[in-house]
Amino acid sequence: MEGSINDARRTNYLVLLRTCYEIYGIYEPLLALFAVYSVAVVVYRLYLHPLARFPGPKLAAATGWYEFYHDVFRGGQYLYEIESMHRKYGPIIRINPHELVVNDPDFYNTVFVAANTRRTDKWSGLEGIGLRGSLAFTRDHDLHRIRRKRYEPFFSRLSVSRIEPIIVDEAKLLAKQLEASSKTGRVIELEHVMSAFTGDVITTLCSEKSPDMIRHPEFGKGWHTSLYNFPSCFRAGAFNSFLEYSTDHINTAKREMLSVDKLEQNNKSSVFRYVLSTDMPQAERDTERLAREAALLFGAGSVTTTRFFSVTIYYTLRNRQIRDRLSAELKDVMAGYPSTLPTWQELDRLPYLHAIVKEGLRYACPFVLSSSLAAWSSLSHKFSSRLSYGVMRHLSRISPDSALHYKQWTIPPGTPVGMSSYSLHTDPETFPEPFKFMPERWLGEYNPKMNRSWVPFTRGSRNCLGMNLAYAQIYWGLAVMFRPGGPRLELYETNESDIRPVLDFLGPLPKSGSRGLRVTVS
C-alpha cells in the first residue's frame, strides 16, 4: 500500500515537471527576448543615456527598483540614501534612470523660474496617485499656465482679504470650541481640531457650504484620517469615496450656475462658481477632471496648513518663553476681540508672530510625492497616518526647450531636476542648529542667505497657489489660540518623538505608534 502511494506521488512529480518544462518551452523565446531587452536597457542607461555621465550609484542609474526598494521595502528611507549619495558623489547626482537631484541653494532659482523666464514642465513620475489632469499634476507648461490663470484671481492677496471674514468666523468658532472643551477635561487630538478648522475654511471657499466639522464632537477626525492616510487613502475604495465627495460639490456648483442670471455668474462667491463662470473650453469642464481638481484643493488646502499648526503649536507650547512672548505681543492688537479685530496683514506685521510663522514654515512646509511612492500608493500599501514635518522629498521640474547649466555640468533639455526644501531648510551653514525651533533667528539683522534658502511654498511658475490663503489661516489660528484670555492649551503625554519625522512617505512621518499632538484645555 505504501509503495503504491509513493509511486503515485512520483508520477505526480513527473507530471508536474513535464508540465513546467512544456510551459518553459512555450515561453522560452519570450523569456529570452525579455532578458535581452533588459540587458539592452541597462547598457543604454549606464553608457548611452544622456545622463550616463552624471555621478551617482550605478544601480540607481540602471533601474528604478533601487529607489523603490529604499522607499517601500526599507520604509521611506530614500531621502536619507540621497543625502548619503550627496556626501559621496557631490551636489549633483542621478537618483534613478531619468532624474537628477541638486543640493545647492544657489541653483534653486535656476530650476524654479517664473513663467516669463522659460517654460517649465512637470515631471510625470507623480501621476500614480489618481489626480492626473488637476492643476498641480498638469505636465505641460502652457496648459498649466492656462489652468492656473483661472484660479489666481481668487487666491490673490486682495481676494483673500475680501474673504477674510469667513476665516475670522471659523477662527472664532475654533477658539470657542476649544474653550468649551476646558469644562470637560477631555484630551484633545489637536491635529483633528486644526484639520476641522482648515477643512471648513477651504470647503466653504470652494463651494460656499461649510461641513461644520469644527462643531462635531470629534472635530475633523474623519477628514483628517482620510487626507493624512496617504497612500492607503488612494486604495480604490477610499480614494473613490473622496472623489465622489468632490464630484458632488462640482455637480452642485454646475446646477447652481444654471439657475442664476449670467450677470451674477462671474462672481467670486466660491472657487467652483468663479472657475465655472470663466471662458473655459468644454473639455476643461469635464466633471471627472474638475472633481480631481476639487479633491486637490480640499486636500492641499487642509493638509499642509494643518501640519504647520501641529508643528508650530507643539514647539510653542513646549517652550513657555515662546508662548508668553507671543501672548504679550498679541495683547494690544487683540484687545478688542471678538468685536474689534485686526486684519491678517496687521498680524503679519507683528515681529515675533511673524518670526514664529517663518520658523514654523521652515519646519512644516507642504509635502511632495516621489515617483516610487506614487506607484506604490496605487498598490494599496498602508502606512501610518500622521505627517508632521516639512518637505522631505525633492520636487522636480523640467526645462523642455533649453539646457540648464550647473557648474561644469550641462543638463540636457527634458531632464527632471529635483531640489528639496527639506535639505535647504536644514542646512546648518544657513540655519545654525537647524533642528531647533528658534523664532529668534528671524528677528533683527540676520543672515540674508536664510531668505534665499527659505522656500516653503517653492518658487516660480508652479509655486503654491494658496499661499495667501494659508497665511491668513495661519495668522488667525495662532492669534485666537495664543491671545491673552484665549484657550489655555497644555501638552498631554506628547513629546518631540511624536512630532519629529523618521520616515518619508509622501510627506514625513514620525515614529511608528505616534499618537500625534494631544492637549488639554484649562
From Swiss-Prot:
The function of this protein is: Cytochrome P450 monooxygenase; part of the gene cluster that mediates the biosynthesis of the sesterterpene stellatic acid. The first step in the pathway is performed by the stellatatriene synthase that possesses both prenyl transferase and terpene cyclase activity, converting isopentenyl diphosphate and dimethylallyl diphosphate into geranylgeranyl diphosphate (GGDP) and then converting GGDP into stellata-2,6,19-triene. The cytochrome P450 monooxygenase Stl-P450 then catalyzes three successive oxidation reactions on the C-20 methyl group to generate the carboxylic acid of stellatic acid.
User: Which membrane topology describes this protein?
Assistant: Single-pass membrane protein
Instruction: Give the protein's recorded name.
Output: Stellatic acid synthase
Query: Which GO molecular function annotations are given, in alphabetical order?
Result: heme binding; iron ion binding; monooxygenase activity; oxidoreductase activity, acting on paired donors, with incorporation or reduction of molecular oxygen
- Names of required cofactors: heme
Enzyme Commission code: 1.-.-.-
Q: Which residues cross the membrane?
A: 23-43
